Every structure is written in C-alpha cells, then in structure tokens.
Amino acid sequence: MELLKQRILQDGRCYPGGILKVDSFINHQMDPMLMYKIAEEFIRRFQDRKINKIVTIEASGIAPAIMVGYIMQLPVVFVKKKKPKTMENMLSTVVHSFTKDRDYTVCISNNFLTPEDHILFIDDFLAYGNAAMGMVELAEQSGAVIEGMGFIIEKAFQDGGNLLREKGIRVESLAIIDNLDDCKITVR
C-alpha cells in the first residue's frame, strides 16, 4: 500500500534492536483518514473470504479492526491482555510482547469466539508472530476458523510472517519492512 509506505518513510522512526516507531500516525496518535484507507485495503485483500467476525488484540489493533468491522458491518472483538473480574467462560493463552519484553496471559470470552466464527485477525505489527500465534491457539481452543490475518506493518527480517505462512495461514501485510539496519528504514 503505497500511501502507507510513504507515511512510514516520512514519519516512522527507527530505534536500535529492530524497533520501528509509528506512534505519530498508527498506534498512539492515529490518522483516521489513513486508518480508513488501511481498512479498505484489508477488505479488498480478503474479499474472497467468508468472514463473519473481526478479531484483534488490545490495544493497537483495535483502531484498524474497528474500521474494518464498521465498513464490513461485522462485529469486532478484541483479545484482552488482562482478565477482567467479570469474565467467565474464557479461553486463554500466554503471549510474549516483543516491544514490551514481557509475557501476557491473554483471554477472550468463549461467548465471542465460537465454532461458528470465521474470523479475520487484524493487528498493527507482525514481528516474531507471538500475538498472532496466540490468536491461532485461541481459535483452536474455540473451534473458530481463521480466514486470514492482516497486518498494517510486517517486519520481514523477523520470523512471524514465515511462521504463520508455513502453518498455511493467509497473511496480508500492507507494508513490509525488509530491514532496519543502522536505523535506516527499508520498505519492500
């Protein structure tokens, strides 16, 4: 997605350790017009799939997931990083956050992820694939079918994309970063 690539090159910032910061337009301050275009592109790429629910993980995946759900007129559910006291009948798994370097026990109500669901998982980044693999585990627990996974940005120099594709999951990334060596952003 050319508009997104240009925005990453213009406003993205690189930090040592393979970190790309896009907080000025994606995951802290958001550009709603760009987010709308991102949602339209995800919908275009997955138009051949029979999807009945959009799923993401809190927090940075919520905005693009809501946009996709709004346009497709589908419900959106997000996997929580902390179990609420009021949640019963939950599915859970452990996910490691690359950015925050910590483990989370993520959870989702089995009322909102069922064997009848054909889901599109949306998230901001695909790096090592930890959040996405957590979603795979939750889908397996629930019996839901993952129709595809859409990521705003994929870091191709980390293993997540290959891991998911090797599992036979349809992955669509709108911008692919080939490397961040010497803090120079190289977009495919």
UniProtKB/Swiss-Prot annotation:
<dbReference type="GO" id="GO:0005737">
    <property type="term" value="C:cytoplasm"/>
</dbReference>
<comment type="similarity">
    <text>Belongs to the purine/pyrimidine phosphoribosyltransferase family. Xpt subfamily.</text>
</comment>
<protein>
    <recommendedName>
        <fullName>Xanthine phosphoribosyltransferase</fullName>
        <ecNumber>2.4.2.22</ecNumber>
    </recommendedName>
</protein>
<feature type="binding site">
    <location>
        <begin position="127"/>
        <end position="131"/>
    </location>
    <ligand>
        <name>5-phospho-alpha-D-ribose 1-diphosphate</name>
    </ligand>
</feature>
<keyword id="KW-0660">Purine salvage</keyword>
<dbReference type="InterPro" id="IPR029057">
    <property type="entry name" value="PRTase-like"/>
</dbReference>
<dbReference type="InterPro" id="IPR050118">
    <property type="entry name" value="Pur/Pyrimidine_PRTase"/>
</dbReference>
<feature type="binding site">
    <location>
        <position position="20"/>
    </location>
    <ligand>
        <name>xanthine</name>
    </ligand>
</feature>
<comment type="pathway">
    <text>Purine metabolism; XMP biosynthesis via salvage pathway; XMP from xanthine: step 1/1.</text>
</comment>
<keyword id="KW-0328">Glycosyltransferase</keyword>
<dbReference type="GO" id="GO:0006166">
    <property type="term" value="P:purine ribonucleoside salvage"/>
</dbReference>
<comment type="function">
    <text>Converts the preformed base xanthine, a product of nucleic acid breakdown, to xanthosine 5'-monophosphate (XMP), so it can be reused for RNA or DNA synthesis.</text>
</comment>
<feature type="binding site">
    <location>
        <position position="27"/>
    </location>
    <ligand>
        <name>xanthine</name>
    </ligand>
</feature>
<keyword id="KW-0808">Transferase</keyword>
<keyword id="KW-0963">Cytoplasm</keyword>
<dbReference type="InterPro" id="IPR010079">
    <property type="entry name" value="Xanthine_PRibTrfase"/>
</dbReference>
<feature type="binding site">
    <location>
        <position position="155"/>
    </location>
    <ligand>
        <name>xanthine</name>
    </ligand>
</feature>
<comment type="subunit">
    <text>Homodimer.</text>
</comment>
<dbReference type="GO" id="GO:0046110">
    <property type="term" value="P:xanthine metabolic process"/>
</dbReference>
<dbReference type="GO" id="GO:0000310">
    <property type="term" value="F:xanthine phosphoribosyltransferase activity"/>
</dbReference>
<dbReference type="GO" id="GO:0032265">
    <property type="term" value="P:XMP salvage"/>
</dbReference>
